[in-house]
Amino acid sequence: MLLYRGAPAGPGTPGGGLARAGSVPQAFRIRLSTMSPRYLQSNSSSHTRPFSAIAELLDNAVDPDVSARTVFIDVEEVKKKPCLTFTDDGCGMTPHKLHRMLSFGFTDKVIKKSQRPIGVFGNGFKSGSMRLGKDALVFTKNGNTLAVGLLSQTYLECIQAQAVIVPIVPFSQQNKKMIVTEDSLPSLEAILNYSIFNCEKDLLSQFDAIPGKKGTRVLIWNIRRNKDGKSELDFDTDQYDILVSDFDAEEKEIGGVTSELPETEYSLRAFCSILYMKPRMKIFLRQKKVTTQMIAKSLANVEYDIYKPTSTNKQVRITFGFSCKYHNQFGVMMYHNNRLIKAFEKAGCQLKPTCGEGVGVIGVIECNFLKPAYNKQDFEYTKEYRLTINALARKLNAYWKEKISQENFEPLPTSRRIPDQTWVQCDECLKWRRLPGMVDPSTLPARWFCYYNPHPKFKRCSVPEEQERIDEDLHRSKAKQQVEAAEKKQKPMESDKYQVFSNPPKTPPLQDMAELNDKTIGYEQINSPSLLPSVREESRSPPRLKSLDSSAFQISRKYKLILGEEPVEKRRKIQTEMPLSPIDYSMSGFYRRVEAATAYPEGENSPDKCSSERSTPPHLIPEYPESNKHTEENREAPALCPGSQDQDQGFLLPEELEDQMPKLVAEESNRSSENIDKDMNKGPFVAVVGVAKGVADSGAPIQLVPFNREEFVGKRKRAESWKRANPYSSAAPAATAGKGKDCQDSRSRNMPKIKTPKESEELKRTTEKLERVLAERNLFQQKVEELEQEKNHWHSEYKKAQHELVTYSTQETEGIYWSKKHMGYRQAEFQILKAELERTKEEKQELKEKLKETESHLEVLQKAQVSFRNPEGDDLERALARLTRLRVHVSYLLTSVLPHLELREIGYDSEQVDGILYTVLEANHILD
């Protein structure tokens, strides 16, 4: 069958010759492309797995223009046929939108609340539904209208259609009566004849299964079967799950470790639990809730990495960790726009593990910079995709080597791991909350609410979700980067040189970090023979190494600015004026970061009082050229000797040693106590070291030695042996220690407290300036919080207004489509009037026939009346009786033809019936 458009052929059309130069191409009588019904089946074959087809139907409910909160997947039996049902409480569709959804290639999805739609090609519902079964019915309501649409291969085969036909019937949601359009009547007839519902009442009852005033329900039957005749999906094995039929959980040996195929390959419940990177809706599978999870937050021994694609300037975060549920499953989970595309993709050492390399390691990445394939089961094989896979392989290998090199690490533990962080979704507001501490997710209730949260800040559903610190660090705004670049240019390059050291000891606890906001940075301090026991024990404990975090470097910038306000020459002058204790050169000269620790004698300052004063910063102890040969043998850790409150904390360098020793200032990063969480304890510390110009030019060597436990013990042993060989170098400390602990503490407390008036005045001005700065900072923080609250308020108002605008625009479009001015509505009215006219003509013809019969009866009666006119009374009575019966029959006839005619109180002996009959005949122009 050929379809044409427009008028006869003209120039530029087939058979009409070639178009002239400069002429406009014509579309008249050009053949239209038609779509064969067989395309429905061939299009569905793009999904190699049935779960991929189910994911397409779920994606339609997740899209931002639908915003469904709950999706129900169930199996129902209708007329002894198993049917798959998908029901959501989204926004629903108008008949016009339903027609576009059942057509091919139409997609008008929008971005809402920074959430991107998953669909791209406008083909997901057709391919997904036809992959699961041959026939599908769609029921949708949007608050004003109800609509039913049929997409059926069986229907197209029965009518031998040459193109894809989709019957759609609209109903009024108020009275559930059909809205008459030009195709509503034949569409309803087709649905009732070729679907599993044969009456309109059963069809409309399906709308009652949709919760609320809006939503959509999809019903699929004639489930696809395998070659052996069995259904592709197994509904009987597990009453709360849908499994793939005849699926064997195959096992194979990989590097001596038994590896099972993931549960997501054959269990729909497991597949739905990880289908979305951050789920935003509840899924009920066969009347039981699916425990959705953020797989990136359900791993143990988590490490983060970044990857910068070549096609975009944004950095992409990669998460690596060990699976807590299945120790023998591994691979990279690759998402796109929050949707899982490739699951358990093997990379790096996981491709061909010989000794179990990479087994148990799960990687998570969101590849929004890649383009998914047509069926959303893979990515297009481009250069960017190959570079991404290679980068994942390198980073996964590095993660595996780092974890294996750690002590007491078990790749395959005997007991179940607990995630580093436990996140749970509120059943009411659907927000994700992080629980403090390490909590086993299996111990949480099936329905969890915000008021269960032990954290007092997140006990209400109105509180926004907790922002992830690592996301803020990896995706910093350009404004912050520009500010940082400007600050770097403003620094005096001739005064200090900076070096960045990674892998320092762990950051201080939360309360210490919070106190750093109200403290200044002290000057450098050098070890002396007077050591307090608590400080010595603190300095001997080997610190742990942590990974690098850029956030620590950002927040430490404000302390660097405070130090930058005081010139270097002024600090030198203050240092030379301060009395110093002799320095023990026999001790180790390697650089070490020392945590600020102070012993408080009885009756003196307590830790609470000290929190308002200056705190001792971490230190880096330099190495001298003269003692370089001794450091190979002597590595005993130095310690600090704290002074009193009035004295500047720590000892300063003498003037004669200043040209030989580098001046080091370590800056400790801090965060606000509101924003610091458990991740900050795991985060790294970045030390920014300033080296005086004179010392840097002298060529004094700088060495950083990591503190491993075994190496540290060996250094102590070598130091003790060197001291025994050189007794004179340690005579002073030994003599000091012989006086006893009381003498040592007394000397530590009675350090000289000489301060010049100039220094005291400078210190006072600095303290006042710092107090003003802190007060301004607190004021600015309060204003920022108020502005943030106001911004959130107006943001919510804006979103509400935007939602109302979308609603009004949708209603306006629907009103235009179904208004009385629309041609479709006028056509519907014309069809109704035309049908009434046909019925009236038929009734008129029937009345004419009945009137002819009545006239013939009257003629017979008249003849009988004339023939029986005789004086005999019996004949007259019989004639009157017959006339009465005839009048009764005529009255019955009139009553059947005209139901509104009342003839109950009329006497049949009179001529009233004759008069009424004559009036009816005259009114219908029959006598003419």
From Swiss-Prot:
Region (Disordered): 474-510, 527-546, 599-649, 718-766
Protein name: MORC family CW-type zinc finger protein 4
Subcellular location: Nucleus
Keyword Zinc-finger on entry: yes
Lineage: Eukaryota, Metazoa, Chordata, Craniata, Vertebrata
Organism: Mus musculus
Any single Gene Ontology cellular-component annotation: nucleoplasm
ZnF region ranges: CW-type: 417-469
Compositional bias of kind Basic and acidic residues: 485-497, 626-636, 739-748, 756-766
One GO MF term attached to the UniProt entry: methylated histone binding
